[in-house]
């Protein structure tokens, strides 16, 4: 499992747990004023994927999208004999929501984007120290030592009615044997 898959699986595997935790937050409301009770699972996309519907053209009418791609990687060898290595990876998580023209409430997409951001942040912060991803048989598939969000920027396109955040995420693995 490579690092981008690791981030995607970490988010996917923990999304339903995070939605029950964030459901009912007082500061995030639905159009009718009630607390959010359901947060749809977005489509997670590895930018390198060649699968149909998960590449250049994605239908945002049905689901929000989280696009994950690796920006950089660095390796250092902290010992003289170079028997172990430390790895550091930088990723961008691009959260995207389309405001459809049939939405009667004009701030719905903005609030949905805020909920998606809060859930992604909650998952990454909760699993920030020694995150692990397991396979279907509950066997450890991959792990890291540290994941943290290092920044957030707006990525909106009013003409296309796309709202988004770009999250910068750092992942570190220490003492990996060669």
Describe the role of every protein-language-model region.
Residues 1-82, 130-137:
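Small/polar-rich, solvent-exposed N-terminal microdomains that initiate assembly or binding
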Residues 7-11, 45, 66-68, 91-95, ...:
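Hydrophobic beta-strand residues in large extracellular and virion-surface proteins
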Residues 83-103, 160-174:
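Oligomerization/assembly interface segments of phage tail-like spikes and tubes
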Residues 104-110:
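A short acidic/glycine-rich loop-to-helix N-cap element
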Residues 113-172:
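Acidic-leaning, charged glycine-interspersed low-complexity segments
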Residues 178:
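Long, contiguous binding/interaction regions
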């Amino acid at each position: 499992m490579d690092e981008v898959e690791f981030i995607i699986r970490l988010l996917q595997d923990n999304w339903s747990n995070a939605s029950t935790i964030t459901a009912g937050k007082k500061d995030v409301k639905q159009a009718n004023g009630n607390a959010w009770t359901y947060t749809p699972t977005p489509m997670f996309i590895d930018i390198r994927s060649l699968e149909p519907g998960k590449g250049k053209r994605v239908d945002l009418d049905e689901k929000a999208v989280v696009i994950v791609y690796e920006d950089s990687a660095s390796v250092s060898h902290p010992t003289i004999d170079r028997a172990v290595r430390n790895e550091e990876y930088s990723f961008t998580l691009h959260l995207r929501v389309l405001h459809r023209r049939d939405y009667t409430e004009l701030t719905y997409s903005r609030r949905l984007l805020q909920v998606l951001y809060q859930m992604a942040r909650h998952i990454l912060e909760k699993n920030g120290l020694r995150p692990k991803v397991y396979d279907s048989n509950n066997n450890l598939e991959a792990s890291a030592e540290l994941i943290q969000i290092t920044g957030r920027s707006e990525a909106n396109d009013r003409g296309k009615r796309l709202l988004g955040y770009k999250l910068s995420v750092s992942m570190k693995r220490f003492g990996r044997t060669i």
